[in-house]
Amino acid sequence: MKCEIAVSQSKTELQEFIAVLQKVNVKSYLEIGCKFGGSLWHIGKSLPQGARIVGVDLPGVEHGAKDAQPHLEECVLAVKAKGYDAQLIIGNSHDGDVIEKVYSLGPFDACFIDGGHTEADITQDFNNYSVCTTKLVGIHDISYLRFPEDKKRSNIEVPRVWQQIKKGFRHFEIRHEKKDCGIGVVWV
């Protein structure tokens, strides 16, 4: 698998998010939920040479892919080979050891949350990682419309949680798809 094509987000929404990161001169970036590593690779290579890029993922969990870890590791190595300080933390983003490792590598200019999609997951990731972020936090899947017949994706609660999170912050939304994806951004 090539890092260039392994993206779970809308490509145009991701490009717009990258443009925002570049505009505010992000030099350190944290991604929670990397799956195959495509977004980490695309975002990482768009930042200034030498930027610190950290990914946190737990391959094989719900909405993840059991075979994702080798691809994710390959993408992190590809970013590192381009002259970036890229690191991967394999583990649950809610575990104390993982949080401690992330904090030891921070602070970060920007964080992108695309891990667990339940209310508890999103809230916990936002609360844990917005505090070590100095500029902005992006949250993926704010436009996802739940389809009752799609049982395996029925617990995606991002749109509802996004409505609560954005109330306390200056924010904007990147929405190019009508029923899927979407990136919400809050300034911290």
Residue ranges, per PLM feature:
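S-adenosylmethionine/decaboxylated-SAM
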Residues: 2-188
